[in-house]
Amino acid sequence: MVCTSTSSNFYSIAQYILQSYFKVNVDSLNSLKLVDLIVDQTYPDSLTLRKLNEGATGQPYDYFNTVSRDADISKCPIFALTIFFVIRWSHPNPPISIENFTTVPLLDSNFISLNSNPLLYIQNQNPNSNSSVKVSRSQTFEPSKELIDLVFPWLSYLKQDMLLIDRTNYKLYSLCELFEFMGRVAIQDLRYLSQHPLLLPNIVTFISKFIPELFQNEEFKGIGSIKNSNNNALNNVTGIETQFLNPSTEEVSQKVDSYFMELSKKLTTENIRLSQEITQLKADMNSVGNVCNQILLLQRQLLSGNQAIGSKSENIVSSTGGGILILDKNSINSNVLSNLVQSIDPNHSKPNGQAQTHQRGPKGQSHAQVQSTNSPALAPINMFPSLSNSIQPMLGTLAPQPQDIVQKRKLPLPGSIASAATGSPFSPSPVGESPYSKRFKLDDKPTPSQTALDSLLTKSISSPRLPLSTLANTAVTESFRSPQQFQHSPDFVVGGSSSSTTENNSKKVNEDSPSSSSKLAERPRLPNNDSTTSMPESPTEVAGDDVDREKPPESSKSEPNDNSPESKDPEKNGKNSNPLGTDADKPVPISNIHNSTEAANSSGTVTKTAPSFPQSSSKFEIINKKDTKAGPNEAIKYKLSRENKTIWDLYAEWYIGLNGKSSIKKLIENYGWRRWKVSEDSHFFPTRRIIMDYIETECDRGIKLGRFTNPQQPREDIRKILVGDLEKFRINNGLTLNSLSLYFRNLTKNNKEICIFENFKNWNVRSMTEEEKLKYCKRRHNTPS
C-alpha cells in the first residue's frame, strides 16, 4: 500500500476518532486489535469498541464507547472511520486470514502520533455519540454483496473459510460482520456524495482512484435508472387507470378476469383450509362427547349399584331387630359410605366396644342413652357435585325441628346382634385385626384433560373416591361386612358430617388432635386467580400415616386467606355465610348447621383441623408489578406470536408483520437486536432467527448455483419459493417448528452443513431417516448419575 498524504491524514483522523469519540487513552491505542471493534446490537448503524481480556480477570472485556452515524456526513465519525478502513484494508498486505485475524492491530504503531498534534486537542461537541434513529442514507439504498466485494475483495473468501473451518468462532464472525458494515456504509455515503458534487469532492475523487471498479458499477450509478424506473412505473399505473376508465378495451376484461381468477384461487385455498380445520374440530368434539357419555353412564351404574346395596343392607338390619338412621329425601343413603371408608387401627375399635359393653344393662338390653357413634356417618356433601345443588339450599334454610319429627332408630349393640344372628355365646373377632382390610383409593392428581372434562361435567356425580384432603381429616373404622356375621360396630367420622361419640372416643381422639376446639371443619378451597397465576399452586401431599402428625402452619391461624372464594363471593355460600371480616376460615360446627338434638347431646365432637395452604399475596403483587412496569422502551416492545404453526407464519411475522404491527425485520433495522423484544419471550427469538437465516442462505445458494437465473426476479419471490420448499420439507418429515429449529442448531453445533435438498440439479426436497430425526430433532436431557 502506498502511503500518500491523504491516506496519512486519515490515519490521524482515525486516531482522533478513537480518542475523542470512543474515549480511548493514547497509551491504550497500541494494544487495540481489529477484533475489539464490533457492530453494536442495540443501536442501529453503530460501532462499539471494547477490549477483550484474555487473562483470568473478573471482567471479560473493558468497554470504551458506542458511536453512531451522523446525519451530517461532514461530521460523521463512522464515515471517516470507514474511509480509513477502505484505505487500510481494501487490499491488505499481508492479507487477513483465519490464522492471523486475531493479531491484526486496529492502528499501526508507526502511524500513532504521541506528540502535541493540534488536531487531537479539538473538543468533541457531541458527547452523546450514539443514536437510536437510522440516518436517511442507510434507508435509501441497500448495497448488494457484489458491491461490498468490490470494496473488500478478500471478505467473501474469509467468510467461506469461516463456514467450512470454524463457523462457531464468535470473534471471526464479528470481524466479518464489521467489514460488511464498513463496506455498506462506504458505498451508501460515497453514493450520496456522488449525487451531491459540492460535498467533499476531494474524498470522492481520491476513493474513485483507489477503487475505480466501484464507481464504474451500474448498480452504484443507478440513481438515474431508479428515477426512470419509478417514472415508468408511475406512467404504467396511470395507463392502467385510464384503461379501466375506458370500458371498451379488451385488456380491461382480461385483467379483470385474471384478477378474479387469482382471487378465486386464494379463496378456494382458504376455504379448503377452513373446512379441514372445521372437520378436525367436529371430530374432536365427537370424541369429547363420547368420553362424557361413557363417564355419565359409568356414574349412573355406580350410583344404582350403591343404592341397591343400601336397600339390601336396610332390609337385613331391620330383619334382625336393629335400625339405622333414616334420612330425608334430600340426603344420601348412608350405606353408600361403605364403599368410601376404611377401617382404622383395631386398637381404636376395642375401647369402643368395651365402653359400649359397660353401658349395657344387666339383662343385655341396650338403653335409650346409647349414642349413635357406631352408625356410619354421611359422606361430605361436596364429594357429590350433582347432589350438592339440592342439599345446599336445605342447609341454608334448615331450622330446629322437634324431637318427634326427626325419625331415627337405635342400632343394636354388637354383642346382641352377633348372638341373635349366629346363636354363638362367643363374640366374633374384630375385623380391624385382619391384614386384608380395605383401603382408601386416593384421587389421582388432576391432569389438564381431566380439568377440561370437569368443566364440561358440572352436574355429573364424581367418582366415589375419597380425596386426600378428606383422608387427612377423617378417622374411620370399617362396618359390618355380611348380614350373617356382625362385628363390633366401628366408628365412622368423615369430614363434613355430623356424628356423636362416647366420652372415651372423644377423649382419645382429642388427645391426638392438634386443635383445642371440638369442631368439625371442612377443608377450605384454595384460590385460583387466573389474572395472577397461570397454574394454581398445588399443596404438598402428605402421606396417610403422617396426616395426624401434621400441624397447620402458623400463617393460616394469623392471616385469613383473602383470596378464598368464600371471601370473594358471599352469595355462593348461602344465606348463612359469614360476612367479610369474620373468621370465615375457622371450622364451623355441624351442630350449628343442622341444629339436631343428637349433635347437641353428644359429649364431644371429633376434631380434625383441616390443614390450610396459605398462598402469599406478595407473589402475585410481584407478578402484577412486573407485568405493568413501563420502561423507556415500552412503546416499541413487541411480543413474539404464539400462533405460528408453519414456515409461512414465521415468514409473515418476520418480513410482513402480523395484525398491522411492524415486521421483525423492520424492528431490527430501526431498533437493533434487543430493545424491541419483550424479556419474557426473548429466548424464542433465536429459534426463529436460525430458520430465517437459513432461508437467506438458500436464496444466495440458489442464485450462485443457477437455480434462479433471471436477474430481474425480485429477492422476495426467491424467498417465497424457498419458504415453500422448507415448509414441504417440514411436512414430509413430520417436524414441528421447534424440532426443525433444533435440527438446524444441532447441525450447526456439529459443524455440519444445513441442506434440505437431495441435489442441486432438480432441487428436490429430501427425506430424513429415523436415525437423523432421533439424533438431531430430539432434545437431550442429562440423566442423573
From Swiss-Prot:
Residues 345-359, 366-376, 528-537, 592-619 have a biased composition (Polar residues). The lineage of its organism: Eukaryota, Fungi, Dikarya, Ascomycota, Saccharomycotina. Residues 342-381, 416-451, 481-620 are annotated as: Disordered. GO terms for cellular component: nuclear envelope; nucleus; transcription regulator complex. This is Glycolytic genes transcriptional activator GCR1. One of its GO terms (molecular function) is RNA polymerase II cis-regulatory region sequence-specific DNA binding. Present with 259 molecules/cell in log phase SD medium. The modification Phosphothreonine is found at T447. Keywords: Activator, DNA-binding, Nucleus, Phosphoprotein, Transcription, Transcription regulation. The keyword DNA-binding applies. Residues 493-504 have a biased composition (Low complexity). Residues 632-785 are annotated as: DNA-binding. It comes from Saccharomyces cerevisiae (strain ATCC 204508 / S288c) (Baker's yeast). The gene is GCR1. It comes from the Eukaryota. GO terms for biological process: negative regulation of transcription by RNA polymerase II; nucleosome organization; positive regulation of ribosomal protein gene transcription by RNA polymerase II; positive regulation of transcription by RNA polymerase II; positive regulation of transcription from a mobile element promoter; regulation of glycolytic process. Residues 546-574 have a biased composition (Basic and acidic residues). Homodimer via the leucine-zipper domain. Forms a complex with a GCR2 homodimer. Interacts with RAP1. It is found in: Nucleus.
